[in-house]
A protein has these predicted regions:
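A domain-level signal for the structural core that forms small-molecule/cofactor-binding pockets
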Residues: 1-116
Length: 116
């Protein structure tokens, strides 16, 4: 039941292949934490405003949050986080002067989670 949310800076609208990233991310999640491909769900959210540091540079942010059913160990979650961080730049076109900040986190879904 991976529920995946990708937040990204508005400045990446034309430079971030969000669909391509999701389609590459799903098999990575399956391999790393033993999920089912058909269960992977990703939604992207454009952040209208992103302020990083003193806002002096042309920085951009991609943050990936992954929520899984319980049962995965901390090591598997850490491997997935590192793999996600490595994958993101492959789907963002480089731009002169831009610094891309990438972060990721993996959490267990709340026990109240239900799916229909």
């Amino acid at each position: 039941m991976p529920q995946i949310t990708v937040d990204y800076s508005a400045s990446l609208d034309e430079d971030f292949d969000r669909r391509g990233f999701a389609l590459a991310l799903h098999p990575l999640v399956v391999e790393t934490v033993d999920a089912r491909l058909a269960a992977c769900k990703t939604r992207t959210r454009r952040a209208e405003e992103t302020v990083i540091g003193d806002d002096a540079a042309d920085d951009a942010l991609v943050h990936v949050g992954i929520h899984l059913l319980t049962g995965r160990g901390d090591e598997a979650k850490a491997r997935l986080t590192e793999a996600v961080i490595a994958l993101v730049p492959e789907y963002v076109k480089p731009a002169e002067g831009r610094v891309l900040h990438v972060s990721a986190e993996v959490h267990d879904l709340d026990p109240s989670y239900r799916l229909r």
